[in-house]
């Protein structure tokens, strides 16, 4: 599915429970979309933007409470409106993350719709983070990974996390048992041939020692 270029800034009016509430000055004032997401070119499925902050030693409840829903997009136009109105990755403070998840699932390992899946995880140079994040977003909502997964699997989300020396990106899938049939990494390398990825690996959620903790992991 080819996506048109970003249109001029259109603002959507999010429903009350979709608004992002930030109390951190370093993120600045978020320009919220202003108009209902009812028109435009529909996406194959809705996708939800999330924001959170990951801190070492926090409890499961604290991890989930740090998770903020930004907006659920249903069209290409609403995707661009949200993308253009949230801070760029380069403006996020250390240990903050963006996620885009299929439907309204949360970026939590133990979420029922995620629990049997896993992530491809890789480090990227900070100067490449914004480009990598944008390209992965477009590939994800454009369903460019569909034929790179097993028939009984799909990509269900992407994440970018700001870290000290290098940032981290993750691509989530729903069925870790068939990951051997996937060529998702090859597609990522095709999309971003000039990016130097490091520490690239796949890990099922259930193999994490803290899997039962119910935390957001990135």
UniProtKB/Swiss-Prot annotation:
Point to the regions of Basic and acidic residues compositional bias. 8-20
Annotated positions binding mRNA? 109-110, 163-168
One protein family per Pfam:
IF4E
Keywords attached to this Swiss-Prot or TrEMBL record, sorted alphabetically, are: Initiation factor, Protein biosynthesis, RNA-binding, Translation regulation
Q: Name one GO biological process term.
A: regulation of translation
Q: Where is this region: Disordered?
A: 1-20
Q: Name one GO molecular function term.
A: translation initiation factor activity
Q: What InterPro entries does UniProt report for this protein, alphabetically?
A: TIF_eIF4e-like, TIF_eIF_4E
Q: What does this protein do?
A: Recognizes and binds the 7-methylguanosine-containing mRNA cap during an early step in the initiation of protein synthesis.
Q: Which family does it belong to?
A: Belongs to the eukaryotic initiation factor 4E family.
* Subunit record text: eIF4F is a multi-subunit complex, the composition of which varies with external and internal environmental conditions. It is composed of at least eIF4A, eIF4E and eIF4G.
Record protein name field? Eukaryotic translation initiation factor 4E type 3
In its UniProt entry, the species of origin is given as Xenopus tropicalis (Western clawed frog)
Per the record, the gene is: eif4e3
């Amino acid at each position: 599915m080819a996506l048109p270029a970003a249109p001029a800034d259109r603002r959507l009016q999010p429903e009350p429970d979709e608004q992002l509430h930030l109390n951190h000055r370093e993120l600045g004032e978020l320009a919220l979309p202003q108009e209902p997401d009812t028109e435009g070119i529909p996406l194959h499925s809705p996708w939800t933007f999330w924001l959170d902050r990951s801190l070492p030693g926090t409890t499961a409840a604290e991890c989930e409470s740090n998770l903020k829903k930004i907006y659920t997009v249903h069209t290409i136009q609403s995707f661009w409106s949200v993308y253009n109105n949230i801070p760029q990755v380069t403006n996020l403070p250390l240990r903050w993350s963006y996620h885009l998840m299929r439907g309204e699932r949360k970026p939590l390992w133990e979420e029922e719709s995620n629990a049997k899946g896993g992530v491809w995880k890789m480090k990227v140079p900070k100067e490449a983070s914004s480009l990598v994040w944008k390209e992965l977003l477009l590939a994800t909502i454009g369903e460019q990974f569909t034929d790179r997964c097993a028939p009984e699997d799909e990509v269900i989300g992407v994440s970018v996390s700001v870290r000290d020396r290098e940032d981290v990106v993750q691509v989530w899938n729903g069925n870790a048992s068939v990951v051997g049939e996937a060529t998702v990494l090859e597609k990522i390398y095709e999309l971003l041939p000039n990016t130097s990825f490091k520490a690239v690996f796949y890990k099922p959620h259930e193999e994490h020692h803290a899997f039962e903790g119910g935390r957001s992991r990135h």
